[in-house]
Amino acid sequence: MQQYLDLMRHVLEHGHDKADRTGTGTRSVFGYQMRFDLAAGFPLVTTKKCHLRSIIHELLWFLSGDTNIRYLKENGVSIWDEWADENGDLGPVYGYQWRSWPAPDGRHIDQISQLLDMIKKNPDSRRLIVSAWNPALVDQMALPPCHSLFQFYVANGRLSCQLYQRSADIFLGVPFNIASYALLTMMVAQVCGLQPGDFVHTLGDAHLYSNHLEQARLQLTRDPRPLPTMKLNPEVKDLFAFTFDDFALEGYDPHPHIKAQVAV
């Protein structure tokens, strides 16, 4: 995945050193875009090993509408532990906004179900959008959404997705985000009778934390390897019926893991 290495190199060479909420410090740029053709392989970073199990379970958790980390803990996923309260709750984060956005009249809007219906009935619509950024509830969220809005686009039987990510932790977060939204695009394409197209990843504040700079430089010394292939169970036609066992990654041969600390 040369696109990801190019992003890291660009930030190292052209980024601005800035303070941040966590007190760690970052090197960042504003505005950057990557594009991945999903027909060319599943975009899972190969220059270090990524924990696909966490990516899949987190996505299924988002799609379920859940905002408590209990499901994640039961499946050995700890990526949200630092932000949960003593009961495991995170407030009205991604799952709530995706599946139960509160309307002023008291209704709750299931953005994902509406999206699927619109793709099937009006694939040329320019309104195939899901937003997790709800200004009225941001202060109640344990962590305001970093990947805040995504849009789908249908052309020639192919489904493409563009994500706008307001805040992008390049070393730890972005590899997860690329794989997660690529997988979501494949899942939505399957249940809508389409082929996966491109995943376009647009970043706002794209940053390397100051305690990730050496790890990034190490990763840049490694050559990308061929992308793996992601196989979905073709029998699944309901987006909300996917389970962990419906996914099979083939041909993933990454370089060794590179350890780095999460900035909380």
Curated annotation (Swiss-Prot):
The residues that the entry says bind (6R)-5,10-methylene-5,6,7,8-tetrahydrofolate are H51, D169, A263
Q: Which residues form the active site?
A: C146 (nucleophile)
Concerning SUPFAM superfamilies, the annotation shows: Thymidylate synthase/dCMP hydroxymethylase
Protein family? Belongs to the thymidylate synthase family. Bacterial-type ThyA subfamily.
State what protein this is by name. Thymidylate synthase
Which keywords are on file for this protein? Cytoplasm, Methyltransferase, Nucleotide biosynthesis, Transferase
Reactions it catalyzes = dUMP + (6R)-5,10-methylene-5,6,7,8-tetrahydrofolate = 7,8-dihydrofolate + dTMP
Q: What does this protein do?
A: Catalyzes the reductive methylation of 2'-deoxyuridine-5'-monophosphate (dUMP) to 2'-deoxythymidine-5'-monophosphate (dTMP) while utilizing 5,10-methylenetetrahydrofolate (mTHF) as the methyl donor and reductant in the reaction, yielding dihydrofolate (DHF) as a by-product. This enzymatic reaction provides an intracellular de novo source of dTMP, an essential precursor for DNA biosynthesis.
Subunit relationships: Homodimer.
